[in-house]
Amino acid sequence: MAASLPALPGPTRAYGGYALALLALLNLLSYVNRNVIFGLVPPIELDLHLTDTHIGWIASAFVLLFSVAVFPFGVLSDLRSRRAVAAAGVVVWSLFAFLAGLSRGFWMLFLTRAAVGIGAAAFAAAAASLVADYFPGQKRAVALGVFSAGIPIGGVLGIALGGQLEALYGWRIAMMAVAVPGFLLAALVARLTDPSRPPPTLTVRQYWRQLELGANEALRAVWPLIIGASVGALAAWVLNRQHGATSSLDTAALATGIGIGLAGNLVLVVRRNRRTDGTFDFSPSGSVNDALTEMRLAVDTVLRTPTLKYLFVGGALVSFGMNGLVGWAPTFMSRTLGLTVAQGTLLLGQWGLLAGTAGTIAGGFLADWLGKFTGRGRMLVSSLGLLVGGPLAIWLLAVRDLGVFVPVFAVAFFFLTLYNGPVIAAVFDVAPARIGATVVGAYLLFIHVAGDAIALPLVGFLSDRFGIDRAIFILPSAAIAGGLVLFLGVQTVLRDMAFVAARTTATHPVVRVP
């Protein structure tokens, strides 16, 4: 177990605050780089001759690579230096975010933005685990709320900065400019002190060997993904060359093949993980002795923990709704409210920054305050915020008066962002500490692949055919559904927290079969 920060002397607490501030700033910067493209949609479409569907798939490329990469990076963070993983991730995302500004066509922009997702994944998995160890117990939701404030703040700030910088210097300079700070801050992350934790069981060389990355074993491990991607690529080629299909259908065929392959890989992992007695040893020196077992162990933990299942499914629905809304909001505002790109992104940035910051931090404090009376506090805040904010967002999308739009947007965004801090804290609450980063990696993988990776291109596709004013209504509806699913977890979280606590103190704890 990691050392409990509040029990340490004052200077160590202060250092924990410094680490939290640095990691929160970088999380914000990660989302700035992620969402800057949504403030640049009209000039990019004009310059590179793209459609809304293309933009949706470019955004989805980031999400897909982020989702696929965050799981193994979560494992690596549990086994090796989290600060090294986080720092390397910052460098990678900054490099490819900069290169994206040099794109000359759809595929270069698609691939560079996908690579940004790999770096962001490495940082996200390692940084969330570090924050959770610096601030355990009742302070965890507040700390993760501060860390997660980068999601709404960075998201809307990226859109706002993109629009303003584009108006001054063009979309290419805007995209490259927001990448530069990451290079400078990566060095500070590399020098962070990692909270005390169990000694690593593997060297880096052993880690790669245990992953069985030889050609033969790699093929055996990922054959569903290879087949799915190959079939998707073949279908895209046939559509384009033989039937003259549009490039949006080509990309959709390829992405569908990749998605089916990823689903097949998940099924393969679950089937290989199945044991006759349904148990696993959670002791550091037990069966968790290689990275592949760690991944399988995380999947098994999720499948056998009711609250985690609700968190995963609810999180995917919320990711579908929230990230889709943030991504397509500037385009919606430009086309339905008659605003220029600069005006829309500035308005979104100003009010989104205020409401998102207040909502995320308030959610963490409220969840921890309720935690003094009931262990259900984090799940309650997460679900109720969505159930209030979702209907407000539906009303918002029907408004065409800017004087009404702004206050409704601010209130809706406040309630929708209450979810950010408590939900990650809830994942750590019901996941064994030994594999905490791995479970969070699995959570991020699932919610993005099943959430905004689908929402972003789907809304773009529907927008090209029916208009953004109609297509966008599916997004808040998904967020409401996510709130309902999370509310189911209110009934199970106490039992699952008690089981994790008992398992942690046992000599040879095992996962129970429900």
Question: Model-found features: residue ranges?
Answer:
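Conserved MFS/SLC helix-loop-helix module at the cytosolic interface between two early adjacent transmembrane helices
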Residues: 68-107
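Cytoplasmic helix-loop-helix junction between adjacent transmembrane helices
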Residues: 112-150
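C-terminal transmembrane helical hairpin of 12-TM major facilitator-type secondary transporters
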Residues: 375-423
